[in-house]
Each structure stands twice: as structure tokens, then as C-alpha cells.
Curated annotation (Swiss-Prot):
Associated pathway: Plant hormone biosynthesis; brassinosteroid biosynthesis
Subcellular location: Endoplasmic reticulum; Nucleus
EC code(s) of this entry: 2.3.1.-
InterPro entries, sorted: CAT-like_dom_sf, Plant_Fungal_Acyltransferase
Family label: Belongs to the plant acyltransferase family.
Cellular-component GO terms for this entry: endoplasmic reticulum; nucleus
Gene Ontology MF terms: acyltransferase activity, transferring groups other than amino-acyl groups; long-chain fatty acid-CoA ligase activity
Location of the active site: 164 (proton acceptor)
Induction: Induced by 24-epi-brassinolide (24-epiBL, eBL) and inhibited by abscisic acid (ABA). Stimulated by auxin.
GO BP annotations, alphabetical order: brassinosteroid biosynthetic process; phloem or xylem histogenesis; regulation of cell growth; response to abscisic acid; response to auxin; response to brassinosteroid
Top-level taxonomic group: Eukaryota
Annotated gene: BAT1
Protein name: Brassinosteroid-related acyltransferase 1
Function: Brassinosteroids (BR) acyltransferase with acyl-CoA ligase activity toward brassinolide (BL), castasterone (CS), typhasterol (TY), 6-deoxotyphasterol (6-deoxoTY), and 6-deoxocastasterone (6-deoxoCS) and thus converts them to corresponding lauroyl esters. Regulates BR homeostasis and promotes BR-mediated cell growth regulation. Involved in vascular bundle development.
Amino acid sequence: MPMLMATRIDIIQKLNVYPRFQNHDKKKLITLSNLDRQCPLLMYSVFFYKNTTTRDFDSVFSNLKLGLEETMSVWYPAAGRLGLDGGGCKLNIRCNDGGAVMVEAVATGVKLSELGDLTQYNEFYENLVYKPSLDGDFSVMPLVVAQVTRFACGGYSIGIGTSHSLFDGISAYEFIHAWASNSHIHNKSNSKITNKKEDVVIKPVHDRRNLLVNRDAVRETNAAAICHLYQLIKQAMMTYQEQNRNLELPDSGFVIKTFELNGDAIESMKKKSLEGFMCSSFEFLAAHLWKARTRALGLRRDAMVCLQFAVDIRKRTETPLPEGFSGNAYVLASVASTARELLEELTLESIVNKIREAKKSIDQGYINSYMEALGGSNDGNLPPLKELTLISDWTKMPFHNVGFGNGGEPADYMAPLCPPVPQVAYFMKNPKDAKGVLVRIGLDPRDVNGFSNHFLDC
């Protein structure tokens, strides 16, 4: 949309936001786990809310500010900053009350209706979030930022960024729900945070000590699955270098596409493909997407291909993580085969069984080995790994229900922005259908038509 791309976003004000109350239980330093340290960048999402009055909009920003002040009083690491440990190589969170940043803005002359289908990624969305300049120094980066942008129609958007070192998807969801609730409820104790999802009081637990690597345990339990994972990645890197000896990377541009599947369509696809075999929507869609993407890529039949998907480990550690754990608590499970085996020999039922086996393998030994591997040296960014299909399941985190709207109304839509790894496939709740799923994936422009045809033809 050229008109929208050229539209100026006018910044009305930018201010720092600090915790409203002093938390006497606050730690000055939170030692991060290796899971937390993998991606300190801000992860952005934009929440869209339709028509409101000017007076209502004027109160939106102030209510959000008050709600954030109150929320950070309990979720106090959100007001901190990242910093290196004494050795100068590992990130931790300094709880120094450095504060979050909020911006009020106006999209001059733009109506929400002009954005078209909100489920489809639009480069204009990048203007609806505040992106602090870092110059490579993460110690000055706020861990939470927000931008409230008013549109000409009276609607508005709330663009939120949170550091992935601070939260994973589940804890980000809980934090944002608490923030939305605190923006509208004023007669509550300053030590309690309401989670709108279940209408219960939750207390976040920020201590990561249960996920710090126990090297003795790692030596005792050498997880073959995680070793296999890294062998696949290494093999893919070697193959790429052999084919591109000058290491000239191809165009890294991706097209972000969203495929909307309602519950009836998913059930119809399952019945047609599985012939009575019972499985979850995630299992079916993961297996089907892996085959569709691999087929669209046109890989050599002897090429090794790999499916990896995030698994929540909160209840999988020997001592389950406490309710309200606010850090990163996921590892990747892995399934591998050759392209020939995947496309010509394996049925969807057999792929689903492999997915189940991979998920079942996530125990304390796997977790220990995975985290130990993440703490190893990193010689640089990986080259493109076309053979690797990545999936993140957000269907248990209905972000569109976040009540930042008038009187706590849910969002009309929540759009995640382009992530650091754009080819990751996200499975998200379909706000129009409780059993539906939105599948969002980054694709090479040359593969869009092929993937679309294979994925939708089932």
C-alpha cells in the first residue's frame, strides 16, 4: 500500500515509565538461564482497536501508563536492563528501575479500514511500534516499550515490544494481560495482579535458578535427541558452504503469509488425510505443514530435512517450575528424515507419531543437555537452513483477548511483527472461530505459490 508507506507517524510525546510501588522482595540481579540469553531483542506485537471517541483515546494513554506503573511494581524485572556478568560474556537482568518507554503517536490521515485484512502482515505495522536505537549496546535498551497510535477513524493501535530475554510467549501473555487489567481496575491491592484469562490472582516468579545448568547432571545424562539436533544444523551448514564456497548469502527477503483455517476446515482435512486416526490440531497441522513446505522447496530427495517445534517445559522438569514462572521455559523437539522418506514413504499418521515421540522425549536429561549446548560458543550467525522447518504454537495464548480496549474490550486483532527468524511458522488462535487456527509463516517469494497450493490442497 504505497499511500500508507509514505504516511507520516507524528510523535506526540515519549516518556519513561517507572514502577509505582517499591517491591521489598525485589532482587537486584536476576541470573538468566541459557534459554533466556538466546535472543535479547525486542519482540513486537500490535493490538488493533476500532472506533472510539477522542475523549476515550485521550484516556487510553494515561490509563496504560498507570497500568504499566502498577504492573511493573510486581513484574519488576520489566523495569530493569540487561547487563553482562563479571566475565563479560553472559547476559543477566539488572533490576535497576531503569523503566519502560511509552510513546503517543498519530497516523495522520489513515483509517484502520485502509490497512485491509489485518491478519496479513503489512510493512506499515512496523511504524506502529517504538524501536529504540541500540548501537549494539543492550545495556541501554528498555525491556518493555509501547506505542499508542491514533487513526483518523477514531480507532487506535497499541504496539508492544518485550525483550525475549525477559519473557517467552506464555509469560509475555500473562504480563500483557496483567497490564491490561491494571489499566482498567483501580480498586485493587498494589501487591496483586489479576489475570483476565482465568480471573484469578497470580504472582509472577522471576527467579530462574531452577533452569540454571547443572553440569554434573549433564555429564550423567547425554541426550541423544539434542545431539542429533545440532548434528543436523551443522550438516546443513556444511552443505551450504560446499555449494556456496564464496559464502555469498542469497536474498534474505521473506514474504509473511497468514493462512486462516476454521475449525470445520481443519476437521475436514484431518478426516481426509488420516482416515480415522485421532490426533490434535497441532499434531496434524505440524505434520502437514512440514510436508507441504518441504515439497514446495524442491529439495534433493537425499537431503536431510528436520522439523523442530517449541515445547513448554514448565511441567516437564523433575521439579515442576512454579506457577507464574516468568522466564523462558521452552526447548525445541526435533524430528528428522530424508526428503524422499518424508514425501514418498511416511504417511501423515506416521509423522504424527514421530512428533509425539519427540515431544515425549523432553525430560530433565534432554532439558539439561539442550541448555548446556546453548551455552556453548557461537561462531556467528547460521546461514539459511532451508531444510529446517520451525513451528511455534501460540494457540493457548489468545492475545486478541487482551483487554486494552474501551472498558477492557478485547482487541479486534493482534498482529505479531516480523520476528528475527522470519521463516518460523506460528500457529495462532483464530479470533473468529474458537477451534480455528491462523498459520503465519515467512516464505521465500519463489516458494509462496508452491507452498500455498500444497498446504491448502489436502
